[in-house]
Amino acid sequence: MAVSTRVATKQEVPESRRAFRNLFNCFYALGMQAPDGSRPTTSSTWQRIYACFSVVMYVWQLLLVPTFFVISYRYMGGMEITQVLTSAQVAIDAVILPAKIVALAWNLPLLRRAEHHLAALDARCREQEEFQLILDAVRFCNYLVWFYQICYAIYSSSTFVCAFLLGQPPYALYLPGLDWQRSQMQFCIQAWIEFLIMNWTCLHQASDDVYAVIYLYVVRIQVQLLARRVEKLGTDDSGQVEIYPDERRQEEHCAELQRCIVDHQTMLQLLDCISPVISRTIFVQFLITAAIMGTTMINIFIFANTNTKIASIIYLLAVTLQTAPCCYQATSLMLDNERLALAIFQCQWLGQSARFRKMLLYYLHRAQQPITLTAMKLFPINLATYFSIAKFSFSLYTLIKGMNLGERFNRTN
């Protein structure tokens, strides 16, 4: 007896929205949004407490942290050039981070609305292979959140360790009432405070950077599932080709094709929910990535000592995580959409009714329209844009290196 791959029980149907569980737990910890079922959503008292917590977190990250970085440069007279550059490469990110936080927090309802479209697409899954693909995606996305958090925490920890080895605070932030040069005790207090500030900032940064990668990956999975269903058009439940089906089977094939067209429209609506959010946050990141990478490479190859080089290299890898994975997923989404159009050609359309072929032509026309994501309608979000930014930052480093600033600075000192 052939083993059927159909699953009839509703309880076994996976949910793509579970891929965002760890992500929204991070948003919850940052005071951005309380998930359904949490205490702030079930108790008015906890709702007020969480609202106060959110205000404190927003004031801290949007106002105080950038202010600490900016004011610190008024007191940079006693700082070494490596310390200035280490602080500057992070300060660029910290000062621009509020724009990303505001853009993301303002558009969180759009991301939540996307879950309704995902639920409609998940309901179309019928085979165990489809369920397994969704479960693997859920597992990967939740692990990816931890991967980002760990990578950013490694940078923060490495900078903290290097600070103690060099006897200087990690970023020499302006902290009222503290002068790290006055005593060893004040140095230790300042270093620990900066470490905590940077860890919290990294939590924000990692959450703001990973969400786009996760959402685009989930959309890619839905496109791949749709392509699998389209390829099976014109076949029976066992996968056997029906070249000249009877009238009843032709109607069933037409109905399945209609459902695939509706799935494609739902997928486009899903993209309409998430693309404006990604557009705004990645635009901000594109604007500063070249400056950050250029500053970091100048620090690594010209001024930094061995300990600072290690921390700066880790930071450069973290900066790569801010844009490269999102650009990769956007490029892969375009390729998956092209494979969807090819899947239409591979379905069993020969011998089908005229109505089926007309609908298939309409579907082919819609599917051949490319899915292109843009950053504020100015820059395409793809790997070509990322490599252009990387080339520009390397050109900036080459220009600075050609000016022999390192030798001039050493002669001056």
UniProtKB/Swiss-Prot annotation:
It is found in: Cell membrane. One of its GO terms (molecular function) is odorant binding. GO terms for cellular component: dendrite membrane; plasma membrane. Residues 72-89, 166-186, 303-309, 391-413 are extracellular. Keywords: Cell membrane, Glycoprotein, Membrane, Olfaction, Receptor, Sensory transduction, Transducer, Transmembrane, Transmembrane helix. InterPro entries: 7tm6_olfct_rcpt (IPR004117). It is a multi-pass membrane protein. Expressed in olfactory sensory neurons in the antenna. The chain crosses the membrane at residues 51-71, 90-110, 145-165, 187-207, 282-302, 310-330, 370-390. Signal peptide: none annotated. Residues 1-50, 111-144, 208-281, 331-369 are cytoplasmic. GO terms for biological process: calcium ion transmembrane transport; detection of chemical stimulus involved in sensory perception of smell. It holds the Pfam family 7tm_6. Glycans are attached at residue 410. The atypical heteromeric and topological design of the odorant receptors appears to be an insect-specific solution for odor recognition, making the OR/Orco complex an attractive target for the development of highly selective insect repellents to disrupt olfactory-mediated host-seeking behaviors of insect disease vectors. Odor-evoked OR currents are independent of known G-protein-coupled second messenger pathways. Belongs to the insect chemoreceptor superfamily. Heteromeric odorant receptor channel (TC 1.A.69) family. Or2a subfamily. Interacts with Orco. Complexes exist early in the endomembrane system in olfactory sensory neurons (OSNs), coupling these complexes to the conserved ciliary trafficking pathway. Odorant receptor which mediates acceptance or avoidance behavior, depending on its substrates. The odorant receptor repertoire encodes a large collection of odor stimuli that vary widely in identity, intensity, and duration. May form a complex with Orco to form odorant-sensing units, providing sensitive and prolonged odorant signaling and calcium permeability. Highly sensitive to the sex pheromone of the silkworm moth, bombykol. Intriguingly, the fruit fly detectors are more sensitive than the receptors of the silkworm moth, although its ecological significance is unknown. This is Odorant receptor 7a. The lineage of its organism: Eukaryota, Metazoa, Ecdysozoa, Arthropoda, Hexapoda.
